[in-house]
Amino acid sequence: MSESIATLIPLEAVDPVLIERLLDRAFGEDRHARTAYRIRAGMDWLPQLSFAALDADEMLVGTLQCWPIALRDPAGRPVPLVMVGPVAVVPERQSEGFGQGLMSAMLDAEARLAQPNQAALAQVLIGDASYYGRWGFSAAPTGGWRCPGPYDPARLLARGANLAAMPAEGMLGPWEG
């Protein structure tokens, strides 16, 4: 993590208007049309796995949100997953380690929340394998998964101890369990 990060805080401590402004700056105001938004439509982000990065001047420079979603197998049975993202950093502060710090905070929180003798839920995201691979995300388990909108299959990445038990085929969408 960069020395630039002064503080990682729970995302729920940040004004939602500031979060939306940061996301617009990082991804553009048309970001709501992206497939990731369709996958998590109608869901509230998971506060225990969502964080904000403040720089040394206590300015908001990054956010990470996680969402409850499901992979529905061909028979329609839902399997719960956590969708990671967006991982957003303001453009002028990218490549300073803020995204890495946010990912590390989320994975640490996920490990603390894990139940004894039970694997944590698998995580999925749409992103660059070269970046997210350092945390074990891979496109290998998602080859038969589909999304409700356009996406590059090489960018649909997943990680988790229980991926072998996941359906090989299915559609990602909001958790409705």
Which role does the model predict for each range below?
Residues 1-38, 45-61, 163-177:
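Short amphipathic alpha-helix that is part of the acyltransferase structural core
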Residues 36-42, 143-146:
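Short, solvent-exposed loop/turn elements at beta->coil junctions and helix N-caps
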Residues 50-52, 59-72, 80-88:
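Conserved beta-strand in the GNAT
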Residues 116-117, 123-152:
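Conserved active-site alpha-helix within GNAT-family acetyltransferase domains
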